[in-house]
A protein has these predicted regions:
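C-terminal amphipathic alpha-helical interaction region
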Residues: 394, 402-466
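NAD(P)+-binding Rossmann beta1-loop-alpha1 motif at the extreme N-terminus of oxidoreductases
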Residues: 1-71, 93-96, 123, 130-136
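Rossmann-fold dinucleotide-binding core
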Residues: 6, 82-85, 100, 106-216, ...
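C-terminal substrate-binding/catalytic lobe of Rossmann-fold NAD(P)-dependent dehydrogenases
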Residues: 178-179, 191-408, 413-414
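Glycine/threonine-rich flexible loop motifs
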Residues: 73-88
């Protein structure tokens, strides 16, 4: 049997694209899918790359087709399917073989599998970029033992996206579940960025009465400036596209109900465990949840009337608001990553993470070069305090405040933008209102509090009033 350099299990959309990418970069690859017909069809449609792909119809034949010590990538659904696949591989692999879970795994599962004493080596690896990225160059975030990563880093460097400076967007993040954790936060930022774009789209459509073509032109113009990014680029394209069945703009024929695979929710939940404030990301998750309640929303409109009213906001103010919101959601994401690094002992390299995200992934953005520089200069400083971003925020916050206040006054739902503004105002207030919370907590629960002076008494004079 012919020998492959590497193997891949799971020929769904992402797995098939990644396998072709690997083959195209000069690494003969063995593939297996639990449904044999899928494997046969994949090989039959591989075109010029078919000679670099070894299709196999049994797991034993798949393992035998890979040159030892083996490296095997799993691209199967997260959760029990991964555990089942690891169990099936166990009797077939040698102790020095390496299995890489490249699916959207919960990092807790990756930690558990890393600590389970598997009889082979194991890496968790986040892959971002969707089908197009997997095929032509994703961003890759590895997690596990450094020596194991070194074994396959040349493959990952070859297949990953390349930043403008030519650097590969692939790196080991840290031990165990670190790679999947960073990918999870990436997805949380993705939720937030998409939601803010949707909110300004709604203001242009419902508040300013702009048609899809005009909105597309605005997005395209923004993509030439500070907001240059994959998500702004595709926003211009989707608003410009026409439905082939009706001729209407594509956004106008799409049901207003957002799907989600759960990684944004995971981010929001884990942030609570880490005491990491990420309100923009949490608002984005909430917005998707609300979008799913179509019947209740329709009933609410019937009872209270349609919410969005005309709201004439200059597109330049929307641009500035979106710039500030984007900085804030990235800042919150990096703060969460920093907290996880400390909690789990991962020593995550924040500038390296920003560099990995510069190309290939869904949240790639021109801002990430400046973020990498700011984090390299001072990784412990919140991004909003880095001079470059502080200047952008100072210039843009008045516009964000205007957009949020006018939009909310006209009945527009702006959960992510408004959450970003509230977070910013809290972050620039040295003395807020938590002293009132502490007094209340001490009144009903004798929880105590810290004082501003040197008095040692940490309880109030509530006595039996509680």
């Amino acid at each position: 049997m012919a020998q492959a350099n590497i193997g891949l299990i799971g020929l769904g959309t992402m797995g098939a694209a990644l396998a072709l990418n690997i083959a195209e970069k000069g690494f003969p690859i063995a593939v297996w899918n639990r449904t044999t017909e899928v494997t046969r069809k994949f090989h039959a449609t591989a075109g010029d790359l078919a000679d670099s792909v070894i299709p196999t119809e049994s797991l034993a034949d798949f393992v035998a087709a890979i040159t030892p010590p083996r490296a095997i990538i799993l691209m199967v659904p997260a959760g029990p399917a991964v555990d089942a696949q690891l169990e099936a591989l166990t009797p077939l692999l040698d102790a020095d073989d390496l299995v890489i879970d490249a699916g959207n795994a919960d990092f807790h599962d990756t930690n558990r599998r890393s600590d389970a004493g598997l009889p082979f080596h194991f890496l968790g690896m986040g892959v971002s970029g969707g089908e197009e990225g997997a095929r032509h160059g994703p961003a890759i975030m590895g997690g596990g033992d450094a020596a194991d990563w070194d074994r396959v880093s040349h493959v990952m460097d070859a297949i990953s996206a390349k930043a403008d400076d030519g650097e590969a967007c692939a790196a080991r993040m840290g031990d165990a579940g670190a790679g999947h954790f960073v990918k999870m936060v990436h997805n949380g930022i993705e939720y937030a960025d998409m939601q803010m774009i949707a909110e300004v789209y709604g203001l242009m459509r419902d508040g300013m009465g702009m048609d899809a073509g005009a909105i597309s032109d605005v997005f395209a113009g923004w993509n030439e400036g500070v907001l240059s990014s994959y998500l702004i680029e595709i926003s211009a394209k989707v608003t410009a596209a026409a439905d082939k069945h009706t001729g209407k703009p594509m956004p106008d024929v799409i049901l207003d109900r957002a799907g989600q695979k759960g990684t944004g929710r995971w981010t929001a939940i884990e942030a609570q465990h880490l005491s990491a404030p990420i309100p923009v990301i949490e608002a984005a998750v909430m917005a998707r949840n609300v979008s799913a309640r179509l019947d209740e929303r329709k009933a609410g409109q019937d009872r209270f009337g349609a919410a969005p009213q005309p709201c004439d906001v200059d597109p330049s103010a929307l641009e500035q608001a979106l710039i500030v919101g984007k900085i804030m959601c990235y800042a919150q994401g990096f703060t969460m990553i920093s907290g996880a690094s400390e909690r789990f002992g991962w020593t995550l390299d924040l500038p390296e993470i920003a560099k990995v995200w510069r190309a290939g992934c869904i949240i790639r953005s021109s801002m990430l070069n400046d973020m990498a520089d700011a984090l390299a200069e001072n990784p412990d400083r919140n991004l909003i305090l880095a001079p470059f971003f502080a200047d952008l925020i100072e210039r843009g916050v008045p516009a964000l405040r205007l957009v949020v206040s006018q939009g909310i006054a006209a009945g527009h739902a702006l959960p992510a933008l408004a959450s970003g503004l509230m977070w910013f105002d809290m972050m620039r207030t040295a003395r807020g209102t938590a002293n009132m919370l502490q007094a209340q907590r001490d009144f009903f629960g004798a929880h105590g509090f810290e004082r501003l002076d040197d008095v040692q008494d940490t309880h109030g004079p509530w006595g039996s009033n509680a």
